[in-house]
Amino acid sequence: MGGVSGGDYILETHRLTKKFRGFVAVYDVSLRVRRGSIHALIGPNGAGKTTVFNLITKFLPPTGGKIFFNGIDITQEKPAQTARRGVIRSFQISAVFPHLTVLENVRIGLQRSLGTSFHFWKSEKTLSVLNDRAMELLEAVDLAPFASVTTVELPYGRKRALEIATTLAMNPELMLLDEPTQGMGHEDVGRIVELIRKVSVNRTVLMVEHNLSVVADLSDTITVMQRGSILAEGSYTEVSKNPQVLEAYVGTADE
């Protein structure tokens, strides 16, 4: 098996399967994510994409199959163990603290990465050592001018940028982005696309995304899922010409 050697592939799944009381959500999925690439997972609603994310990040145990990260079998690990290895997921629903400032949200991400999670009672002086790094991350996602803004007041697209900043604070080697442009207007989509391109330098990104123009713009490799299994894989040019892929998307009005 290639998974035991790591090498060019940062993440590999071998025949990954998940069943819920007889319903097969994911079946026989063998995925290989090349180190340093942007890899998109696409498919109609109910194709199993989010379940695959949940399996990779250990929010669900697999019914069968194996998961390798950097050549190490992580199939039985707890979510926190896998996160410590550098597999970090940005959630589809904006996972930020709405009543804290933008800076404080990123600082919490830094605290998590240092193992001082949620010590809100620590003195401001103690926490201020994290501020410089937090500001660097905010600058990376063009949020430095919003540092002192209460998060609830941020526009939606900026909240998604903040979510990416808090994910970066966890120092991901493999960054999983779940629907990063969902619910955005055209201008915000463009901003997030450029942001993903920027933060993907020297790291690997695996993303679930419905917006096919975003997928075409960003992805090195695309895996198309349908009914829990892999239907096709390749570049955007390759998969967009695949008759099975075209058929899978016909009639899915929300795609």
State each model region's role:
Residues 2-255:
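Glycine-rich phosphate-binding loops of nucleotide-dependent enzymes
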